[in-house]
Amino acid sequence: ARGTMLLYHYRPLADEIFRVPILLVMATSSRGYILDLAPGQSFVEYLLKCGYDVYMLDWAPPTAAEKHLNLATYVDDFIPDCISKVQADSGETDVTLAAYCMGGVLSTMYMALNPDGPVKNFVCFTTPINWHGMGLFSSFSDKRWFDVDKLVDSLGNVPPEVIVASFDMLRPASRFAGNIRLWDNMWNDEAVKAYRRLERWGNDTLPLAGEYFRDTTKKLMWD
């Protein structure tokens, strides 16, 4: 751990192990346990049983003293630092990056800046690449009415409530629809447990470092 950066190592659960380790890079607003919710409901568990050596770059809530962390900090510092730690711990030079959501954005930027780096394979999922095709997100953050400087200068770090509200505006009926699905499966104990796990994660959003939020808004959403 180093400030908001957390690095975990999961041991393989197979006799034959792939040589190249996998580094999972989480979204900066999401807790990493979404990929390891419970036995039988875990992407990490699946990879371990397949024989992969799995590491995860996860995030702790940034403190008030970390409000200065910006886009470059994540791309040029945290990701290469974790890759170096994975290399040292595994004894391997090559690394596979598998990145989720904004973790994929950061990893894509790292890859573009380090084309001859140690990443052998790169996979990203639910990752926005074309920022001009962000639809409602682009409308919500339009510079004509969204003053990101005022927001960050006033609050420092951006609280999770702001992040959750933005996603709720994108899908205003999603919570209601989720409750309907829960009701339809009320007598299925496993379905209820799985729903509660996912719902807990969905409400366990992280705040974002102020300068990082300012950077992503201006350099990605606006530029």
Residue ranges and their predicted role:
Residues K219-D223:
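Active-site nucleophile elbow and catalytic-triad environment of alpha/beta-hydrolase enzymes
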Residues Y55, T96, N121-V123:
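A structural signal for isolated positions on well-ordered beta-strands in alpha/beta enzyme cores
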